[in-house]
């Protein structure tokens, strides 16, 4: 749900130019995330290419959070697919081609598990010299939301995350300590639903579904996790942070991710 909002936000921000999007298995399987990404692009009236990515983590079994996002990954909301055929090129190849066509300029935003990015960095070792930066939603300075130690995106594929953080590409991490502050409450998405356009209506439906689950665990709103790295690219002045070395635990069953 917040992935869909992040795409709509990126499309709406005049500071950003979208080159392409990719899908990866995460909270929902690739069989949902790939067509859903195409549906959102179609909804906003754009024609950005959407590339299929990894169906599972590099070394581990996938994790699915169906309760939060519904069986179809969009809270049960049905949207039409675009009439154009799906892109056949794998996400990791498309990423490399895009970076190679504009060396030092491409800013990559990652809002899911880092499997696609890690595969691309491994397959194309020079990719790390071609990317301008990676801005990602993942991790947390303190605590997690999947285990006491880990946030979902990193926990889902810690091996991929370790590859990305060790790559040397300048990386900005928007962790839970940041994203949990970016919260929409019921009055917010009800107001958006009243805007009278397709995107506002979708936001109201998506967060209505998420709220039916989240409200039962004591939270006061729905965190906009994936919008944070998108907003950071357009308005970095809204954020503060610090430099840190990051190591991803890939072995311990207690602190994985």
Say what each PLM segment does.
Residues 40, 44-51:
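A glycine-rich helix N-cap at a beta->alpha junction
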Residues 23-26, 53-55, 249-251:
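Acidic/polar N-terminal loop/beta-strand segments that form early-domain functional surfaces
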Residues 50, 164, 230:
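A residue-level signal for conserved active-site and pocket-lining positions in enzyme catalytic cores
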Residues 45-47, 103, 243:
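Short secondary-structure junction motifs
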Residues 1-39, 72, 77-181, 186:
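Active-site histidine-anchored catalytic micro-motif
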Residues 6-12, 17-18, 155-159, 174-257:
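Conformational coupling and interaction surfaces
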């Amino acid at each position: 749900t917040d992935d869909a909002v992040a795409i709509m936000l990126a499309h709406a921000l005049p500071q950003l130019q979208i080159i392409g999007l990719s899908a990866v298995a995460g909270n929902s399987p690739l069989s949902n995330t790939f067509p859903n990404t195409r549906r959102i692009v179609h909804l906003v009236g754009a024609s950005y290419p959407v590339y299929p990515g990894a169906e599972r983590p590099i070394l581990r079994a996938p994790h699915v959070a169906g309760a939060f996002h519904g069986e179809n990954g969009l809270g049960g909301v049905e949207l039409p697919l675009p009439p154009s055929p799906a892109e056949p090129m794998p996400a990791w190849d498309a990423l490399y081609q895009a970076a190679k066509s504009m060396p030092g300029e491409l800013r990559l935003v990652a809002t899911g598990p880092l499997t696609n990015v890690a595969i691309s960095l491994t397959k194309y070792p020079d990719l790390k010299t071609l990317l301008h930066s990676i801005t990602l939603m993942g991790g947390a300075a303190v605590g997690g939301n999947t285990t006491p130690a880990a946030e979902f995106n990193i926990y889902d594929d810690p091996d991929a995350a370790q590859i990305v953080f060790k790559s040397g590409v300048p990386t900005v991490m928007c962790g839970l300590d940041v994203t949990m502050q970016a919260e929409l409450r019921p009055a917010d998405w009800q107001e958006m639903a009243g805007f009278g356009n397709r995107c506002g209506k979708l936001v109201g439906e998506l967060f209505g579904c998420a709220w039916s689950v989240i409200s039962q665990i004591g939270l006061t709103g729905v965190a906009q996790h994936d919008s944070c790295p998108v907003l950071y690219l357009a308005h970095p002045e809204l954020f503060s942070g610090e430099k840190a070395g990051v190591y991803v635990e890939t072995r311990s069953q207690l602190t994985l991710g």
